């Protein structure tokens, strides 16, 4: 366990344009929720924050496609994403919005502080303007023929076919990816740049001090810091209508009228603003004790969760904003980053509708099925792959055959022989003593993995704890003992029933609904076990045989789902 009693947890904030797929979920929100639930169960004070990332060109275009004003579209999609998060039992203390007044004010505040520190430069640059669209086009919204390979759908930042990096002016016959118009003009425009290069030494020292970070996190950070020309200054404003208006604190910024801050500047600041939103909502009383080191946050451990594509911004750009401000904001202590989850021999694709999206997943199965499979296959050290065959096999084996079967067998056996009450029986014997010793070791190992956020190892240990109980029940065989020694059968039954609240407490971070069902069936509360003594349920304690925890996935279901989610959303 961390030596601090308070942990701040943030998940990379999902973009507003549409519903996210399972690959997005397992790379940020879901493991963050696992860790938050675990720490709360162990008695820590936790603040778990997430939000929707609402600014930028894709939001404007998605709103136009939906026929809605962008503010209305973002409000609607925030509500949709919040409802889906509840469906997956994501236990955010607050699910905020980057378009909030709090984030506007805080983003403008940081920009002012950075400018005061000499870390903002005004840069004249050339950008492509589309007359038909009435807007400057981001590089990736310009298409044309690649001068290198001739691919006719190359984007203005890179050719997907030959991977050559491009500028929009390199393209042959360029056109707007929004309207298809070729009526384009290169115009001069002025933008603000964050002078990250001035903070390179400070950032390098800070990253080097994080010796406990995952290799994936530090390797990406150091690559961006050191490769090629090293850390580059970064544009933090855009010529758009929708976003945080450019201001220097509370004051107007001459020459920046009509511009907004770049989404990647304001989005991480929303982590802080989200806590301020939570105060307004009433879910917490004081946000600064979590975020300001001079106001109590010096005893906070801050952990971030994200996919590997977000690592450069969280290890360099956002820390540059924090450090450059010269103010005592809380910097991240640990960044848990993830590789990609691929889908059935290819990639998940939001644009092509390929793979399972979060709303669809909840339509076909309860959230615990998805939570268990995704977390037990979390892409921590390498990319992972979702296949329907593996999903069916693992869910049926782990959840139905091992955990669900154990709970069903022992509760139904007890009901048939002793009623729905924990029997008295004799004393425990060598089998029980051996299992308690084994479970004590496994409990310690499980907690070690959870403390270290080694998710796959933690899942494997939890599975082994379930298996140990199943093997005990099979070996002790109370149904056989009952024929010749009812007292011994009663002792076995009492012991095995006590495994259920033990399992419920340990399983709750992974499968909260099933854990709650186990606890309710045993007429007890969900609590984290201090040890494996298994004394929660005394003789005479009443219980109710719970409903089937996990139904098996049939071959017909698997085949139907594999066909349904092969491409193009319904």
UniProtKB/Swiss-Prot annotation:
Compartments (UniProt record): Cytoplasm
Cofactor: how bound: Binds 1 zinc ion per subunit.
Obligatory cofactor(s): Zn(2+)
Pfam families named among the record's database cross-references: Anticodon_3, tRNA-synt_1g
Binding, ATP: 350
InterPro entries reported for this sequence: Anticodon_Met (IPR041872), Met-tRNA_ligase_1 (IPR023458), Met-tRNA_synth (IPR014758), Methionyl/Leucyl_tRNA_Synth (IPR015413), MetRS_core (IPR033911), MetRS_Zn (IPR029038), Rossmann-like_a/b/a_fold (IPR014729), tRNAsynth_Ia_anticodon-bd (IPR009080)
The family this protein is said to belong to: Belongs to the class-I aminoacyl-tRNA synthetase family. MetG type 1 subfamily.
Quaternary structure note: Monomer.
Record's function text: Is required not only for elongation of protein synthesis but also for the initiation of all mRNA translation through initiator tRNA(fMet) aminoacylation.
Protein name, UniProt field: Methionine--tRNA ligase
Taxonomic source organism: Jannaschia sp. (strain CCS1)
């Amino acid at each position: 366990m961390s030596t601090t009693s308070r942990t701040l947890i943030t998940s990379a904030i999902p973009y507003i344009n549409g519903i996210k797929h399972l690959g997005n979920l397992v790379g940020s929100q879901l493991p963050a929720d696992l860790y938050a639930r675990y720490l709360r169960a162990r008695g820590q004070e936790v603040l778990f924050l997430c939000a929707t990332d609402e600014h930028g060109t894709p939001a404007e275009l998605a709103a136009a496609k939906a026929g809605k004003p962008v503010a209305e579209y973002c409000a609607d999609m925030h509500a949709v994403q919040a409802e889906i998060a509840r469906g997956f039992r994501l236990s955010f203390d607050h699910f905020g919005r980057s378009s909030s007044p709090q984030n506007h004010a805080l983003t403008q505040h940081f920009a002012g502080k950075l400018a005061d520190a000499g870390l903002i430069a005004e840069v004249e640059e050339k950008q492509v303007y589309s007359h038909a669209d009435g807007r400057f086009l981001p590089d990736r919204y310009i298409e044309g023929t690649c001068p290198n390979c001739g691919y006719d759908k190359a984007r203005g930042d890179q050719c997907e076919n030959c991977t050559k990096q491009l500028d929009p002016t390199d393209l042959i016959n360029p056109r707007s990816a929004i309207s298809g118009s070729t009526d384009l003009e290169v115009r001069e425009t002025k933008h603000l740049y964050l002078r990250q290069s001035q903070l390179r030494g400070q950032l390098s020292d800070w990253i080097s001090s994080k010796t406990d970070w995952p290799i994936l996190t530090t390797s990406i950070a150091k690559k961006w810091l050191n490769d090629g020309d090293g850390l580059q200054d970064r544009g933090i404003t855009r010529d758009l209508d929708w976003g945080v208006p450019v201001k220097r604190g509370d004051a107007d910024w001459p020459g920046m009228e009509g511009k907004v801050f770049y989404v990647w500047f304001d989005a991480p600041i929303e982590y802080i603003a989200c806590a301020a939103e939570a105060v307004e909502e009433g879910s917490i009383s004081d946000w600064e004790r979590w975020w300001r080191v001079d106001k109590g946050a010096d005893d906070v451990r801050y952990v971030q969760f994200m996919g590997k594509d977000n690592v450069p911004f969280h290890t360099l750009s956002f820390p540059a904003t924090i450090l450059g401000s010269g103010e005592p904001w809380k910097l991240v202590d640990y960044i848990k980053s993830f590789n990609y989850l691929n889908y059935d021999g290819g990639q998940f694709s939001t644009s092509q509708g390929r793979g399972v999206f979060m709303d669809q997943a909840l339509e076909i199965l309860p959230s615990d099925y998805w939570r268990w499979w995704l977390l037990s296959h979390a892409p921590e050290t390498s990319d992972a792959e979702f296949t329907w065959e593996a999903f069916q096999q693992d869910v049926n084996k782990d959840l139905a055959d091992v955990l669900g079967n154990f709970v069903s067998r022992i509760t139904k056996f007890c009901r048939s022989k002793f009623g729905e009450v924990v029997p008295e029986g004799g004393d425990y014997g060598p089998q029980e003593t051996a299992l308690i010793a084994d479970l004590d070791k496994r409990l310690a190992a499980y907690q070690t993995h959870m403390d270290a956020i080694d998710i796959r190892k933690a899942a494997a240990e939890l599975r082994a704890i379930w298996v140990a109980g199943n093997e005990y029940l099979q070996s002790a065989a109370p149904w056989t003992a009952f024929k010749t020694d009812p007292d011994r059968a009663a002792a076995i039954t009492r012991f095995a029933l006590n495994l259920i609240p033990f399992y419920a407490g340990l399983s709750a971070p992974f499968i909260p609904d099933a854990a709650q069902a186990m606890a309710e069936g045993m007429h007890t509360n969900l609590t984290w076990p201090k040890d494996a003594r298994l004394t929660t349920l005394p003789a005479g304690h009443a219980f109710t045989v719970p409903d089937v925890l996990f139904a098996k996935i049939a071959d017909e279901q698997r085949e139907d789902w594999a066909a349904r989610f092969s491409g193009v959303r319904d």
